[in-house]
């Protein structure tokens, strides 16, 4: 297996998604907060989007089954939540750090993986977005909340913007790791601005 820059960035994305899911479980008032349920929420948040992407692409076995390092990244993320719950919860609430970094990383990597499987650009952008958001959809559903992508804040749209930028820079033969960083950074910046300024897409009206 090639342990490239993007590979380690992907593991970092897995870890921050685990932290996002586990801290969401800890913060939820109606959640039981036992060790297994907190771990499972973090686990399903981390692997949900990538699993759906791999199934769609026919990439079997799915990534977390064939690469044990993904499971280790999940374990490390869960361990951080258990050992430093107040610290990671503060970061998550004040900086939107883990969700924001997670979707930035996973959108771009999902887009790249789809392209590597010979998928057209439009489908690659959608699969990149799905890679980033589907774990969060499952997390919010488990928490009995409206999934984040259906709320006012700009979320999935930021992922699509990052995917499109990645595709454009890839077409211009931008260096792969630089493309990853720039495209993921665009997603992070859009999310932070949207949250800071309370921006959202306009509602559709039914006449």
Segments from the language model and where they lie:
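Helix-coil boundary and interhelical linker segments in multi-pass alpha-helical membrane proteins
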Residues: 1-6, 55-65, 110-123, 168-179
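Structural signature of hydrophobic alpha-helical transmembrane segments
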Residues: 4-15, 62-76, 120-132
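The first (N-terminal) embedded transmembrane alpha-helix
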Residues: 7-21, 40-44, 162
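C-terminal ends of transmembrane helices
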Residues: 19-30, 54-55, 79-92, 137-147, ...
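Cytoplasmic-side transmembrane-helix entry/capping segments in multi-pass membrane proteins
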Residues: 35-41, 67-71, 92-103, 127, ...
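Small-residue-rich segments of transmembrane alpha-helices in multi-pass membrane proteins
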Residues: 39-48, 98-112, 154-167, 188
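Short, structured motif recognition centered on aromatic/hydrophobic residues
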Residues: 40-44, 51-57, 126, 130, ...
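Membrane-proximal helix-loop-helix units in multi-pass membrane proteins
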Residues: 89-148
């Amino acid at each position: 297996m090639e342990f490239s820059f993007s590979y380690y960035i992907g593991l970092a994305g897995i870890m921050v998604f685990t932290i996002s899911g586990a801290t969401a479980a800890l913060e939820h008032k109606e959640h039981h907060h036992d060790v297994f349920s907190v771990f499972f929420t973090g686990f399903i948040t981390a692997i949900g989007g990538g699993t759906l992407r791999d199934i769609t692409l026919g990439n079997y076995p799915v990534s977390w089954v064939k690469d044990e390092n993904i499971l280790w990244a999940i374990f490390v993320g869960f361990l951080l939540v258990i050992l430093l719950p107040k610290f990671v919860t503060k970061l998550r609430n004040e900086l939107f750090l883990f969700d924001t970094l997670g979707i930035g990383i996973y959108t771009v990597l999902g887009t790249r993986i789809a392209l590597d499987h010979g998928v057209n650009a439009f489908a690659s952008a959608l699969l990149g977005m799905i890679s980033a958001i589907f774990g969060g959809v499952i997390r919010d559903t488990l928490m009995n909340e409206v999934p984040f992508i259906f709320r006012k804040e700009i979320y999935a749209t930021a992922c699509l913007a990052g995917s499109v930028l990645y595709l454009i820079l890839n077409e211009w033969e931008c260096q792969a790791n630089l493309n990853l960083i720039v495209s993921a950074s665009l997603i992070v910046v859009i999310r932070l601005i949207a949250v800071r300024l309370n921006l959202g897409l306009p509602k559709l009206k039914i006449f």
